[in-house]
Regions:
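Catalytic domains of riboflavin
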Residues: 1-397
Length: 397
């Protein structure tokens, strides 16, 4: 790798935030601050569901009763990673079992040790939530199991994982309250999940505001950036001997490093050909896993060189070498689906999206054999105009 002082520069670009979006988010935060609930909606290509959301600081028996009566879903308290660690709550997942598809991080169920009767009443559950969310709470203040299910929010919030768990904690923090929330899925009277049209009627009926994960992402991106570029160099990739520019990024959450491999220039002018690739030492270097990681990576390099310009964002592995060995032993196809996250790279793409934003990219053509729309992608100021299959997929079809 050779240092090059004339490397292309891609200054970070601010997202254009329209007044309507700003007004919606600020109004929602103000409602959370004042003790009101909001309806928090995720992306239509994720669950396309809405949760009643309230700051844990404002929980009450009346609020629990409203959620149980009108929301009808599961009532959970959302806690930061630090609070879950403080309370010494183990995750509700067996080491040899795959976790929930969307990476929902349940801990074991809890109950307040004192101040409750059976634990299931609205007042009992409100009390348990107050105890669990308190900054003064200790492990001995709770018993296990109980009638309240805590959810652990990822550090970095919706900028790292675009879910209602993280969003509820973010909203409480942005409102100047203790970063803990209470959420409850909204169901229709017939037991089906309420979708956007149902949620709009629900909001009008109960005079509640609707917020979306994508809106909150856009709002946070105006003031918070989780990645920074720390080094750049010129390298030769592929088999053509052509120079690429490699930028090294580091995130501010846990100092994980990622790479942006850039070929060509004028990335901002038209839709840029991009590949988001989750790294795997065994798969990419030694081809030891049953997935197509190494082949896909090489095909992406070739495709971008033929195109004349493009970017590969190489993200750190979701797990560690032990996880990769277990994946090889168990025949797990995608190494990105193992280890610390069972949701795969397309579920928690926030850091990679921020890298693309830093390069000035707004619209992209995504190189992938899994043509699904990323949840909340518009919240990062990015738009996928086309899914481009890799060569091996085109040959197979």
């Amino acid at each position: 790798m050779t240092r090059n002082r004339r490397l292309p520069s891609y200054p970070p670009r601010q997202l254009d935030i329209n007044p309507g979006l700003l007004e919606r988010v600020v109004a929602g935060i103000e409602d959370i601050r004042s003790g009101k609930m909001v309806i928090f909606v995720d992306d239509k290509d994720r669950e396309n569901e809405g949760d009643l959301c309230l700051a844990a600081d404002h929980i009450s028996a009346d609020a629990i009763n409203f959620m149980a009566t009108h929301g009808r879903g599961r009532i959970s308290v959302t806690l930061t990673e630090a609070q879950v660690e403080r309370l010494e709550l183990p995750m509700m997942q067996l080491p040899d079992r795959q976790g929930p598809t969307l990476g929902t991080a349940f801990t074991v169920s809890i109950e307040a040790r004192e101040g409750v009767t059976t634990g299931i009443s609205a007042s009992d559950r409100a009390h348990t939530i107050r105890v669990a969310a308190s900054t003064r709470a200790k492990p001995e203040d709770l018993v296990v199991p109980g009638h309240v299910l805590p959810l652990k929010a990822r550090r970095g919030g919706v900028l790292v994982r675009a879910g209602q768990t993280e969003g509820s904690v973010d909203l409480a923090r942005l409102a100047g309250l203790n970063p803990a929330g209470v959420i409850c899925e909204i169901m229709n009277e017939d037991g089906t999940m309420a979708r956007l049209a149902d949620l709009e009627q629900f909001a009008e009926r109960h005079a509640l505001k609707i917020m979306t994960v994508a809106d909150l992402i856009r709002y946070r991106l105006q003031t918070e950036i989780l990645v920074r570029r720390i080094e750049s160099a010129s390298v030769v990739l592929g088999r053509t001997g052509k120079p690429w520019t490699v930028h090294l990024y580091e995130d501010s959450i846990d100092s994980l490093q990622s790479l942006a491999l850039v070929f060509g220039d004028s990335l901002q002018k038209e839709a840029t050909l991009c590949r988001m690739h989750v790294g795997s030492t065994l798969g990419d270097v030694f081809t030891a896993l049953s997935g197509d990681g190494r082949r896909n990576l090489h095909e992406a390099i070739d495709a971008i060189e033929v195109e004349g310009r493009g970017v590969i964002v190489y993200l750190p592995s979701q797990g560690d070498l032990l996880s990769e060995l277990q994946a090889a032993k168990g025949g797990v196809r995608d190494p990105g689906m193992t280890g610390k996250s069972t949701t795969g790279p397309l579920r928690e793409y926030g850091l990679g999206a921020q890298v693309l934003r830093d390069l000035g990219i707004r619209s992209l053509r995504l190189l992938t054999n899994n043509p699904m729309r990323l949840a909340g992608i518009e919240g990062y100021g990015l738009e996928i105009l086309e899914f481009v299959p890799l060569v091996s997929a085109r040959m197979t079809s």
